[in-house]
Amino acid sequence: MLEDLDLKINNWIINTVNSFIKPNKLDKIAECALQLSKIIYYNDMNVKKYLEEINLMQKELNIKRESSNINFSRPTQIIELINEYMFKEQEFKANIHDYQNPLNNFLNIVIEKKIGIPITLSIIYITLAQSVNFILYPVNFPRHFLVKYVLDDANHNEIIIDPFNNGRIMDDYALKNLIDSFFPNQNIPLTKKLVEKANLSQVMIRILNNLKDSFFEIQEFDKLNIANEMIFAIDPKNTYAIRDKGIILQEKDPEKYLELLNTYLELEPEANDADIVLKIIKSIREKYR
């Protein structure tokens, strides 16, 4: 099992992390997500097959663009074109009834079922847009992944798009309502930081964290461990991965468990779960002294 894990992580590092994620090759965002699916769950999956399906959609969208009367100086018209193709012709839709299902994080399943959550629908949206030379960037918005088109980076002139809501254009009012819906009564200000461009590392780590939460709920600790090690391969100093590795090791290696939890608190002394982690440390020390 350990050798199998090492092989998976080594493949992830060589074929995806070093090749695409670290250089932040956004044109490979779909391939990264598919490799993630293959390593964690669908070991026999043919990644090339799904890339060919994406490529076919890209070609169809490009043909649609060439036959249209779109004014390319007006980004909203290009957004309308992508929305028409993705949500009406291809019939991709938001999985509002089974949002927490871990399958929503696997791009191969989203391509097959035409249903997903904000982050996977955003990956498809970004990839389709690339085929018509419309460069979009991922946005790691709290609790709800978005994408954006940058008109003028220096002056923060941009268009925020929500692929989970059929490509709706989000103005500041809509964004504020969205964040208030997730954090009621906290009056979190809408800042430029919340809609910053995300890099490939942040996108893949967000998917992996989603999966970790799901695997923890269903007690699939082997899969949780794989996802956690995949995060470490991207970011060896990821504080939540350090904490979760400690939790995974708590029965196998309590001393290492304590070391990791202490490291987590050193890196995140103001963490929301700091009090809980301190109680765990105390209970482990009492148990093994």
Predicted features along the sequence, with ranges:
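A structural boundary/capping signal
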Residues: 1-289
